[in-house]
Amino acid sequence: MSDNQNKPGKPAAKPQSKYPVNMTDTPFPMRGDLAKREPQWVKQWQDQKVYEKIRKASKGRPKFILHDGPPYANGDIHLGHAVNKILKDMIVKTRQFDGFDAPYVPGWDCHGMPIEIQIEKQFGKNLPTAEVLSKARAYANEQVERQKKDFIRLGVLGQWDKPYKTMDFGNEADELRALGSLLEKGYVYRGLKPVNWCFDCGSALAEAEVEYQDKRDPAIDVGFPFAEPEKVAKAFGLAKLPTNKGYAIIWTTTPWTIPANQALNVHGDLPYALVNVVRNGVPQLLILAADLVGTVLQRCGLTGETIAICEGSALEGIRFKHPFADLDPGYNRESPIYLATYVAADSGTGIVHSAPAYGIEDFISCKSHGMRDDEIIAPVMGDGKYASWLPLFGGLTIWEASKPICAKLDEVGSLFKLVMFDHSYMHCWRHKTPIIYRATSQWFAGMDVMPKNQGATLRETALQAIEETEFFPSWGKARLHGMIANRPDWTLSRQRQWGVPMAFFVHKETGDLHPRTPELLEQIAQRVEKDGIEAWLTLDPKELLGADADMYLKNKDTLDVWFDSGCTHQTVLRGSHKEELAFPADLYLEGSDQHRGWFHSSLLTSSMMNGRAPYKALLTHGFTVDGEGKKMSKSLGNTLAPQKISDTLGADILRLWIASTDYSGELSISDEILKRVTESYRRIRNTVRFLLSNTSDFDAAKDLVPVADMLEIDRYAVAQMNAMQAEILAHYKVYEFHPVVSKLQMYCSEDLGGFYLDILKDRLYTSGVTSHARRSAQSAIWHLTHSLLRLMAPILSFTAEEAWAVFASPDVNTDGTIFTHTFYQLPEVSDGAALLAKYTLLREVRNDVTKQLEEVRVAGGIGSSLQAEVELKASGDKFAALASLDDDLKFVLITSQAGVSQVASAEEESVVVTPSTYQKCERCWHYRADVGSHAEHEGLCGRCVANLFGKGEARRFA
């Protein structure tokens, strides 16, 4: 396709005239036909190894590294993928054009649950682990190839023949080495802690894998019976209680946690009331927050009287019976009151029941009061069922147990109120099912653990790294800061098969790691480098441990997949692609959800390994929504596939839509929006076609007119493009694309189509073919085209390449692509600033004249503007600007005659339009007094005779 050179001009296919104008043509078609042509360019880029040519051309330049956040290798790409990849491509290309060496190495995230689920669906749940791994690897490779093809079709240039994959053996090995580094530095520990747990996954979840959906649960007020009435009396300053029958009242939406209750929490500084009530004819005492007495009594349908008040701190240590203590000896235990600052009196009862196995705050509170790990009651198993040893409810799932638990509470008189409650609740992002906090033994990276070098904690290092990072948009900084400041320790371990193993040997009795763990991890990494993670599966411990093997177990946990992608600054930037890339990256770019995903995990791993962020800047984009602002989903039927858009409208339309949308918010798309984008594209394409057509008989080596020798309006056009290019490059530098598109559209439709090219047509079409006047215009157009094609190439990559193949001369287009070039260095215009000011004024006048001409035309006074003669009265700078054009003023106004006279003030200024009384020249269509004055050419005006048969007309300004 690239041999489609802009051949010397030829008359367009119109009826031959006796006096033809210079109507040149171009092989660059008016219709883009993008869906058909773009795949041909994709093939040409691949066949001619354009990406390799770009790398060769930019060797030695300063590097710009955009590190690709890896999409997950499962399923076809959707519109969100397209937005992400095209934004990255546009940024890489702008930096490349700006004089950097900007490589792009795409990557894929390959381990984890979704692929494991696919293998289970296809082959069943009972496959041997070795088969799961081999089939998962094959499946991931197949998905990578599918996605790769679609990404390439979008016009994204990159190292597609050597991407990175987190499942590459070298990456898996380097990930183990990274784990070893964190272990040696003292960040990694093993402990019992409540973690996000999905019953369907059968595994812990990362924070980024949790989403919130509405859920309906029983909300219950529950009484914990007094076990130490004397201490209650003392706390409230009473000699004796009126009755020993009483309850501490709690409120919860998780009845299933009641069997695991081990404590109650109050706030030490809040006032608590002792309330006397009669319930079912029996006097009873209730303890609850003083500020909530009225609300709780009303909710429970009770009336009562507050007989005493004390501060929460007075209740510390008082014990209460478990509600089921009288039903089964297994619940014959007491729950002490602990003080906790997280307790509030704005809802509930002001007393919080604490099940340390199923709540982070509960766990922290109980541990801080001396509870040992082996004392924590944890009856919920990994599949969501209660263990068989749990009295009354063993074998039930926690969700189906809610009803019998509430029934038993009612039976013993501890259920004060039950209502169904709708609230936002944690769900697994994969299965869309509710999850819980569940205390299990896991491996963690400690946020506040003192590392072995006695330096800053992980939290401190990461927060400092955020301060040193640039954010686009700026609000991303506060968002990431808040997440890091408040997050719990990172659960590194998962209970799955398809993932990088936490390849530890754990002592059977003590649970300690083997003393040679760092050395062993390196030996295992070397095996993984050769055979993949399968090497750990098949490893006989005796091969590495010798006689110690009988004392140790192979750890079965795998690493969180967020650790996989979060380590790519180490495994890719400094590992598999260290020759092409570099650490730290200049930019990470992903959707705004990645503040808790890839941005987050990458920051944590790099803070531990390197003491800094792996990126200098973070850029986030919003999500795609339909034309009405609704989230896209298959169920709503409002999705648009990028493949379909490319195959019908063309990828350049998709690219232009992305570039023209402010990606910092939601990106709206619909057929109607794409229709408007297509119209916008046509305007740009038609402008490019005009430029190509009118330089098709122009050879810059012979015909280029120096800027200083150009006509004034041509110098203005070059100066204006210089100013606009500077503005566009400033936007590109800060990753802003929608202002670029807006400026390009305005430039093509208003600056060129509505002014400069409109004026230029007369000179291009009617001046002598090789005249200075025409060559001056073509020289300006030649400069503008060089600049315009490169400015639009990062966005409209296919169209710019197609136009470049037509426009660029063989000596310039040595690589056969626009993408090995840099932004065009436009020539300086010595009087550029003055010309910009002057022509800004002239354009204002021209707009006024055009309005007057239109009024006369509508009234039937004239046909076209060339049928008019205009007399202007102007004052001050306006008069000076108009008068300076002399006889060329008529060309700027596109009238057959124009004159200007000076007046003293703006109030006296006027525009007078008069229909011409002269004949129309059959060639230039001007109405002139000298039409027919040449006997041999009766239909021509004097200037056309001069342009065709003489020295040509003299033009200085326009």
Curated annotation (Swiss-Prot):
The keyword Transport does not apply. Binds 1 zinc ion per subunit. PROSITE patterns: AA_TRNA_LIGASE_I. Residues 1-32 are annotated as: Disordered. A motif ('KMSKS' region) lies at residues 631-635. Gene3D superfamilies: 1.10.730.20, HUPs (3.40.50.620), Valyl/Leucyl/Isoleucyl-tRNA synthetase, editing domain (3.90.740.10). A motif ('HIGH' region) lies at residues 71-81. ATP binds at residue 634. Its cofactor is Zn(2+). L-isoleucyl-5'-AMP binds at residue 590. GO terms for cellular component: cytosol. Catalyzes the attachment of isoleucine to tRNA(Ile). As IleRS can inadvertently accommodate and process structurally similar amino acids such as valine, to avoid such errors it has two additional distinct tRNA(Ile)-dependent editing activities. One activity is designated as 'pretransfer' editing and involves the hydrolysis of activated Val-AMP. The other activity is designated 'posttransfer' editing and involves deacylation of mischarged Val-tRNA(Ile). Monomer. This is Isoleucine--tRNA ligase. It comes from Janthinobacterium sp. (strain Marseille). The gene is ileS.
